[in-house]
A protein has these predicted regions:
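Extracytoplasmic gate region of multi-pass secondary transporters
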Residues: 35-36, 229-286, 342, 346, ...
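Helix-breaking motifs and short loop linkers at transmembrane-helix boundaries and internal kinks
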Residues: 47, 79, 100-106, 117, ...
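Conserved MFS/SLC helix-loop-helix module at the cytosolic interface between two early adjacent transmembrane helices
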Residues: 66-105
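Paired small-residue
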Residues: 90, 94-97, 105-113, 326-333
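Helix-loop-helix hairpin linking two adjacent transmembrane segments in secondary transporters
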Residues: 145-198
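C-terminal transmembrane helical hairpin of 12-TM major facilitator-type secondary transporters
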Residues: 299-348
Length: 417
């Protein structure tokens, strides 16, 4: 862009829309995953088995599924901004209340309600990105937003470990819930629903962007029939099945990595810092894969290769035996490859579906993935209770990722014009 038309950094849509969305999802992801660091202490203090912890963790995803399609529909036809604002307030309050659970039933109910209010956030944000970024930008835009996932883990695990060490697991939930209540006000002030509504956007940038987005919408065509037909669109069904298989493995690994490392004899603070390594590598992979995907305007094979490699690395983790370094290396490679898929993966449904129904399709895809998320943590916990190790669980997780890659192969991506 020429110097005469360059806009101020604080008005740049990449910083404003994606920056605020990034922080929002960091807070969301910390509040949903910090329980992974608290599991060893909660099991000891509350007397809860690994399988029960896994079941309670899985209940988060049952709640998460409920609002996927309704939130996606509301984001498409009403307001993604307002839906996310409400969800942000509610999930922060529920996360705060986790500090006060005393029984298995209370923990299970708390995780379900937390999932209910976090459920629509990703779906609504993907719809918001669809309203703000062109097809040529979308994998990178999705990645800037979704890189919040590994960054949240990099931040949360060490911080959670330090708070746990000095103040206990209850204070960890309190300290990490409060920022969400404050950030809700920032979200309401900073975000505009569309470029047309953004008073802070440079007029020339606004005109150019609106023209490009309208041209892409025209190319995608109008939705055919009732929006509910989107639920059995071939690409939506294949992506939903793929995401189920992928997230079953990913969430199983994510929630139990701290426990796997803790069982090698490490302190909780050391576990917190080491558990930050896999998502840090994942953040780098997300950037590299997103740039490649946008440069080549190719989504499907970037997604498939990353997912298959992640499965292979999980299978290879069996070679590490009881070596802390070996386990960490293979889990880091697996998580890094898996996170690399996110940018192209979430660009696909916005490119194969008309804008008016994209939110519904994204909701189903995300909901199916998080149904897999109910299975993964529970299955890993059951295997740990029955066998005394996570070996079988990692094997099944690796196979699930490879099967997911095969499921995605028939998807047809629309050629870039």
């Amino acid at each position: 862009m020429a110097a005469s038309t360059r806009i101020a950094p604080h008005r740049n849509r990449w910083l404003r829309i994606l920056g605020v969305s990034f922080v929002t999802y960091v807070l969301s992801y910390i509040d949903r995953t910090n329980i992974a660091m608290a599991i060893p202490a909660m099991r000891t203090e509350l007397g809860i088995s690994a399988s029960t912890i896994g079941f309670a963790t899985g209940m988060f995803f049952w709640g998460y599924i409920v609002l996927q399609i309704p939130a996606g529909r509301l984001a498409s036809v009403w307001s993604a901004k307002r839906v996310i604002f409400c969800l942000l307030l509610f999930w922060s309050v529920v996360s705060f209340s986790t500090a006060y659970v005393h029984t298995e039933a209370e923990l299970i109910a708390n995780r379900f309600i937390l999932g209910l209010f976090e459920g629509g956030v990703l779906t609504c944000t993907i719809v918001l990105i669809r309203k703000w970024f062109t097809k040529a930008e979308r994998a990178r835009a999705n990645t800037v937003f979704l890189i919040s996932i590994p960054i949240a883990q990099v931040i949360a695990n060490p911080v959670s470990g330090l708070v746990l060490q000095h103040f206990g697991w209850q204070m960890m939930f309190v300290v990490e819930a409060v920022p969400g209540l404050v950030w809700a006000l920032v979200w309401l002030w900073a975000i505009a629903e569309t470029p047309e509504e953004a008073k802070w956007l440079d007029p020339q940038e606004k005109s150019r962007l609106m023209a490009e987005l309208k041209a892409e919408d025209a190319q995608a065509g109008p939705a055919q029939g009732h929006w509910i037909r989107t639920l059995w669109h071939p690409a939506v069904l294949l992506l939903a099945l793929y995401n189920f298989a992928a997230l079953m493995a990913e969430w199983g690994v994510t929630f139990w990595i701290p426990t796997v490392l803790k069982e090698t004899g490490l302190s909780i603070v050391t576990v917190g810092f080491l558990a930050a390594l896999p998502p840090a590598v994942g953040a780098v992979m997300m950037i590299l894969v997103a740039f490649s995907s946008d440069r080549l305007q190719e989504r499907k094979w970037h997604m498939i290769v990353c997912t298959a490699l992640s499965g292979v690395f999980l299978l290879m983790a069996q070679l590490a035996g009881h070596s802390t370094i070996g386990i960490l290396v293979f889990l880091t490679l697996a998580v890094g490859a898996f996170l690399g898929r996110f940018g192209p993966f979430w660009a696909l449904p916005t490119e194969v579906l008309p804008p008016a129904v994209a939110g519904v399709g994204i909701g189903l895809i995300n909901g199916a993935g998080n149904l897999g998320g109910t299975v993964g943590p529970w299955f890993f916990g059951q295997v740990r209770d029955l066998t005394g190790s996570f070996t079988l669980a990692l094997t099944v997780g690796g196979i699930s990722l490879i099967v997911g890659s095969l499921i995605a192969m028939p998807i047809r991506q629309r050629k870039a014009s």
